[in-house]
């Protein structure tokens, strides 16, 4: 009973009306889960999906409804004894339990067979409405030969070969149409158990996590990875083959769940079929430790009770059992035999500690360098192989196949020597060069294992490729100078009188900078901006790669718990890390590329949450580099269908200068030149002073430098005097003379 309703029964107050309107007006990502995580929807697609759901429900509900109607007549004996009524009620409950058990058994066995597949028109309607585009990346000749062979009888093959020589080449539009594929979409997460026959325990774990409506990327990828791709069309007799997959989907759309569910289900099946064979069956590669640990945390929730083990790769772990290690250990034992007896016990303990046991895990989540060092003994030996690995997953694939990680990632890929290896690449941004590299690598593997025509390579794109999510608000603010950016940031922390043009951003939020020194400087500048009553300096923290693993994990834990409100960081947290309750992102320094901007602002607005804000400050030095960001904001607003005044005006897009390819490459590698930490010339040093993050005057800074210089000089004098008087340290005080 609600106490407020009880005490206000005689009044005319309407409870709940005012709060609901207030809540709807101030809807933020931190207020909770979105009702529907999907970014793109339409009434036609919803109707098709509803028909698919209700079609199954009618079949399931038909039996219990009839039983319930029969039971109602027995329960309506109002003039019978109380014992009889109780016994009839208990009998009805027992019958209900039996019916539920029978119904669960039917759901697991017969519903998948009874469920009608969508035809190609319905599949096309659903996929187009959710802006899902699936493309076959194989050569056109290979696609056409497979389709024609499935349609034509064997007698007509000779005639077809003769006609192929005379047929004209397809236009670009016809080629795109020939490559388009319309697979069966996922209607609901319940289908994973009933139709795709995933493990019962895995299905229960998914339900416990509260997943009900699949996002666009889950709607498109899960059927392909669980059921496979029908190479010769959507006919029932067509053979389904698990494809290699390239996925480009918005940030926060559930890509981690999309690749973990099929991998876990595949390993569970393998455990049932071959109980004796154990080892690493899947490798998930991520660019940062934070993202890798997040994937492991999500995976542990899904593998609970399934018998599948998921492990985070750490320094010193052994992944394979090499014969070279045994030879080396025996050699070291022989060399230490002649040592003294006092040193025998410590040496044996050191040997035991040095050789760690081989990791017993089914799924290994790692960063590239850690696994390469483990397989090559810190680059001192040739790469060992992982012969049992059947799935390799590259999360944030565009970074892993970029110059920084490319060699390490390809070494891991080549080390997976199983002929049935499947690769899946996932990211929110993926350039054509990355796609070409992945395509060529997969093609080389197929040729090496004589499997040229065995399985397809598909690309799935959700929404517009390489664009920001449409459910957040973007603000591009000109601050002129570094001091202007600091002033704007402080206005976000301490908002004055509200106006229509002001940006209102409530904690928690992230602040991104270009370099580690700038992140440290900004943190020290903002450290005391939050009053002590609200928690003071403990509410602001800085996170970067120079910190130890323990410090980084502690900061991440406190930020997730809500003890830290504002986190200043570099691009270390720009990719993959899922902070679901973040209200906004501040780009204190502009990102190095358009792709980095997409990933930075994608830390807010996760899983369809509305109300996130992305604020980007730019100065006079940034003007040559801003156009790519302005274009992304403009496309995002068009995708959103936003009415009213746009944040990016056409005159601004026309006025901003274009950037050459050379300058783009330089910006991507080093960032804005004025903010680089390794400046050499005097002219660059003057530019660096302009971009210093500080509100101290030049006089105060000179006085501080003088003080530091005096302290350093006094320390030098003391060290010199101590070195010149060696006997003074050895003198002892004999006490007072009597």
From Swiss-Prot:
Q: Where is the composition biased (Polar residues)?
A: 20-29, 721-730
Q: Does the keyword Nucleus belong to this entry?
A: yes
Q: Where is this motif: Q motif?
A: 191-219
Describe the location of the Helicase C-terminal domain by residue ranges. 488-656
Q: Where is the Helicase ATP-binding domain?
A: 236-448
- Motif DEAD box in this chain: where? 395-398
Where does the record place it?
Nucleus, Nucleolus
Q: Which UniProt keywords apply?
A: ATP-binding, Helicase, Hydrolase, Nucleotide-binding, Nucleus, Ribosome biogenesis, RNA-binding, rRNA processing
Q: Basic and acidic residues bias located where? A: 43-53, 93-109, 698-707
Please give the residue ranges the record annotates as the region Disordered. Answer: 13-116, 148-179, 319-358, 664-738
Q: Which domain of life is it from?
A: Eukaryota
For this entry, list what GO says about its biological process.
Answer: maturation of SSU-rRNA
Q: Which residues participate in ATP binding?
A: 249-256
Cellular compartments per GO CC: cytosol; nucleolus
Q: Where is the composition biased (Basic residues)?
A: 708-720
**InterPro entries noted in UniProt:** DDX52/Rok1_DEADc, DEAD/DEAH_box_helicase_dom, DEAD_box_RNA_helicase, Helicase_ATP-bd, Helicase_C-like, P-loop_NTPase
Q: Which GO terms describe its molecular function?
A: ATP binding; ATP hydrolysis activity; RNA binding; RNA helicase activity
| Documented EC number(s) | 3.6.4.13
Where this protein primarily resides, as one coarse class?
nucleus
List the coiled-coil residues: none
Q: Which reaction does it catalyse?
A: ATP + H2O = ADP + phosphate + H(+)
Assembly with partners or alone? Interacts with the U3 snoRNA and is associated with the 90S and 40S pre-ribosomes.
Show the domain comment: The Q motif is unique to and characteristic of the DEAD box family of RNA helicases and controls ATP binding and hydrolysis.
| Family stated for the protein in its record | Belongs to the DEAD box helicase family. DDX52/ROK1 subfamily.
Q: What does this protein do?
A: ATP-dependent RNA helicase involved in 40S ribosomal subunit biogenesis. Required for the processing and cleavage of 35S pre-rRNA at sites A0, A1, and A2, leading to mature 18S rRNA.
Name the chain's protein.
Answer: ATP-dependent RNA helicase rok1
The scientific name of the source species is: Neosartorya fischeri (strain ATCC 1020 / DSM 3700 / CBS 544.65 / FGSC A1164 / JCM 1740 / NRRL 181 / WB 181)
């Amino acid at each position: 009973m609600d106490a407020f309703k009880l005490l206000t029964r005689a009044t005319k107050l309407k409870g709940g009306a005012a709060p609901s309107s207030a809540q709807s007006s101030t809807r933020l990502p931190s207020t909770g889960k979105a009702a529907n995580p999907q970014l793109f929807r339409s009434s036609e697609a919803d109707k098709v999906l509803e028909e698919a759901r209700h079609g199954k429900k009618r079949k399931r509900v038909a039996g219990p409804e009839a039983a319930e109607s029969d039971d109602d007549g027995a329960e309506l004996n109002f003039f019978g004894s109380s014992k009889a009524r109780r016994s009839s009620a208990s009998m009805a409950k027992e019958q209900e339990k039996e019916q539920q058990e029978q119904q669960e058994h039917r759901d697991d066995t017969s519903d998948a067979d009874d469920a009608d597949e969508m035809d190609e028109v319905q599949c096309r309607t659903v996929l187009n409405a959710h802006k899902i585009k699936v493309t076959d990346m194989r050569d056109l000749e290979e696609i056409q030969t497979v389709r024609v062979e499935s349609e034509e009888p064997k007698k007509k093959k000779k005639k077809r070969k003769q006609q192929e020589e005379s047929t004209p080449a397809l236009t670009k539009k016809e080629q795109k149409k020939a490559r388009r594929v319309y697979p069966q979409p996922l209607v609901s997460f319940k289908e994973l158990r009933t139709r795709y026959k995933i493990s019962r325990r895995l299905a229960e774990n998914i339900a416990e996590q509260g997943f009900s409506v699949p996002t666009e990327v889950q709607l498109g990828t899960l059927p392909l990875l669980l059921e496979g791709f029908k190479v010769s069309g959507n006919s029932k007799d067509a053979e389904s083959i698990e494809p290699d997959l390239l996925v480009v989907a918005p940030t926060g759309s559930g890509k981690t769940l999309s690749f973990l569910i099929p991998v876990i289900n595949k390993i569970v099946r393998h455990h049932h079929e071959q109980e004796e064979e154990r080892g690493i069956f899947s490798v998930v590669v991520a660019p940062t430790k934070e993202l890798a640990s997040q994937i492991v945390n999500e995976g542990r929730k899904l593998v609970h009770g399934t018998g599948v083990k998921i492990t985070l790769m750490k320094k010193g772990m052994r992944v394979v059992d090499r014969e070279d290690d045994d030879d080396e250990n025996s050699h070291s034992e022989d060399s230490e035999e002649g040592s003294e007896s006092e040193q025998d016990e410590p040496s044996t303990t050191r040997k035991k500690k040095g050789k760690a046991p081989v990791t017993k895990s089914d799924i290994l989540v790692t960063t590239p360098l850690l696994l390469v060092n483990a397989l090559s003994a810190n680059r001192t030996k040739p790469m060992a192989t992982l012969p049992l690995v059947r799935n390799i997953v590259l999360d944030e694939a565009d970074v892993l196949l970029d110059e920084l990680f490319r060699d390490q990632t390809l070494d891991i890929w080549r080390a997976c020597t199983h002929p049935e290896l499947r690769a899946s690449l996932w990211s929110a941004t993926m350039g054509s060069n990355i796609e070409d590299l992945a395509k060529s690598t997969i093609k080389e593997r197929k040729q090496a294992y004589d499997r040229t025509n065995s399985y397809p390579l598909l690309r799935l794109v959700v929404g517009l490729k390489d664009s920001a999510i449409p459910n957040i608000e973007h603000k591009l603010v000109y601050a002129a100078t570094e001091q202007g950016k600091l002033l704007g940031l402080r206005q976000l922390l301490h908002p004055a009188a509200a106006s229509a043009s002001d940006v209102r951003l409530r904690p928690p939020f992230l602040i991104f900078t270009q370099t580690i020194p700038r992140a440290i400087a900004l943190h020290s500048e903002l450290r005391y901006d939050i009053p002590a009553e609200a928690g003071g300096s403990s509410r602001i923290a800085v996170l970067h790669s120079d910190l130890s693993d323990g410090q980084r994990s502690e900061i991440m834990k406190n930020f997730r718990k809500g003890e830290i409100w504002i986190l200043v960081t570099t691009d270390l947290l720009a990719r993959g890390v899922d902070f679901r309750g973040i209200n906004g992102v501040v780009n204190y320094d502009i990102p190095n590329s358009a792709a980095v901007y997409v990933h930075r602002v994608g830390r807010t607005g996760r899983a369809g949450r509305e109300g996130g804000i992305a604020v980007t400050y730019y100065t006079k030095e940034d003007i040559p580099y801003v156009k790519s960001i302005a274009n992304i904001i403009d496309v995002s607003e068009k995708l959103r269908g936003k009415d009213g005044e746009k944040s990016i005006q056409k005159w601004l897009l026309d006025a901003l200068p274009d950037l050459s390819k050379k300058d783009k490459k330089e910006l991507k590698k080093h960032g804005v030149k004025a903010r680089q930490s390794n400046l050499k010339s005097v002219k660059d040093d003057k530019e660096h002073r302009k971009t210093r993050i500080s509100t101290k005057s030049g006089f105060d800074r000179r006085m501080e430098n003088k003080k530091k210089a005096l302290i350093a000089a006094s320390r030098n004098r003391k060290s010199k005097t101590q070195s010149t008087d060696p006997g003074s340290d050895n003198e002892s005080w004999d006490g007072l003379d009597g």
